[in-house]
UniProtKB/Swiss-Prot annotation:
Pfam families: Arginase (PF00491). It comes from Salmonella paratyphi C (strain RKS4594). Its EC number is 3.5.3.8. Keywords: Histidine metabolism, Hydrolase, Manganese, Metal-binding. The gene is hutG. This is Formimidoylglutamase. InterPro entries: HutG, Ureohydrolase, Ureohydrolase_dom_sf. One of its GO terms (molecular function) is agmatinase activity. Pathway: Amino-acid degradation; L-histidine degradation into L-glutamate; L-glutamate from N-formimidoyl-L-glutamate (hydrolase route): step 1/1. Belongs to the arginase family.
């Protein structure tokens, strides 16, 4: 059974500059850490949750280690300066999945996300492999059953694989099938796709599903496509697979990208999403601390989470 644990206070440590001025604060001083999972106490806040699971990566023949990412990313976030929006972060702990029960873990995350959103929170989830996206996305669909939900994925991979069981490569096919079962439209956009990393069968599936696809080569000029997608939906779930970044910026993932989309371009693409007033849920997935020798990759990933919380409207 998937277990919930509060985040350790030892993760939220950093440099104390408060002697300089009252507003010389860092995230470890402004994030609220909860000892219980009770989102109803935190309306209008951002639920920071970890999904400590990489069973989907293992099933997808990837490099395991992403289960250790949530706490590594908390440590990287802790010492970053606290600015507007960061005081809304409430650490609601980790969902820890026992191997090999991926399906049970995804259901636990789905229920937790739905509960947070229905309580008036927003969710920022630290994965975990990209299997995180099915649990997270399903929770968003559950919470907004009467509204159109747009799924925006920044990723080198379409993750529309067809297999006999869930993996880190299947979450968006699973979400599409969930939408089919609920007789609702599947709104999915994937930015940063590597044609070299996706078979013709996956491209065909994306075309059949009417997926908005922007290749890595074209992301430097994709703001118009992002805006068009934002405009056509009521609510948005944003998921960032860190392998969308080039290997020289993000080596610490299961499948590093030879080309990728540079961090500055990723930030410019997600800014209008965060400021749209429609973003309800976001996650960072596939970070693997086993391949981060000096913590630099963790800081890259944490900067994305920091920026999302800062821009979130």
């Amino acid at each position: 059974m998937t277990q919930w644990y509060p985040a350790s206070p030892a993760l939220w440590q950093g440099r104390d500059d408060s002697i300089e001025a009252p507003d010389a604060r860092r995230l470890f001083q402004t994030v609220t850490r909860s000892e219980t999972f009770f989102p109803e106490n935190w309306q209008q806040k951002i639920a920071l949750m970890g999904f400590a699971c990489d069973e989907g990566v293992k099933r997808n023949s990837g490099r395991p280690g992403a289960a250790g990412a949530p706490d590594a990313l908390r440590k990287a976030l802790a010492n970053m300066a606290s600015h507007q929006g960061h005081e809304r972060l409430v650490d609601l702990g980790n969902w820890v999945a026992p191997t090999p029960d991926l399906e049970g873990a995804q259901q636990a995350l789905r229920d937790a996300v739905s509960r947070c959103l229905r309580a008036g929170m927003r969710t920022l989830v630290l994965g975990g492999g990209h299997e995180t996206a099915f649990g997270h996305g399903a929770g968003v669909l559950d919470a907004f059953a009467q509204e159109s939900v747009g799924i925006i994925n920044l990723d080198a991979h379409l993750d529309l694989r067809q297999t006999d069981r869930a993996t880190s490569g299947t979450p968006f096919r699973q979400l599409a099938q969930l939408c089919d079962a609920q007789s609702r439209a599947f709104h999915y956009a994937c930015f940063g796709v590597s044609r070299a990393a996706n078979t013709q069968a996956l491209w065909r599936e994306a075309q059949w599903r009417n997926v908005t696809v922007v290749e890595d080569l074209d992301c430097h000029d994709a703001l118009a496509q992002m805006t068009q997608f934002i405009d056509k939906v009521d609510k948005i779930y944003l998921t960032i697979d860190l392998d969308v970044l080039p290997v020289w910026e993000m080596p610490a993932v299961s499948a590093p990208a030879a080309l990728g989309v540079p961090l500055i371009q990723v930030l410019r693409l997600i800014e209008p999403v965060c400021r749209s007033g429609k973003l309800q849920a976001a996650d960072l997935v596939e970070f693997n601390p086993r391949f981060d020798e000096d913590g630099a990759a963790a800081r890259v990933a944490a900067r994305l989470g920091w920026q999302i919380a800062h821009w979130w409207r």
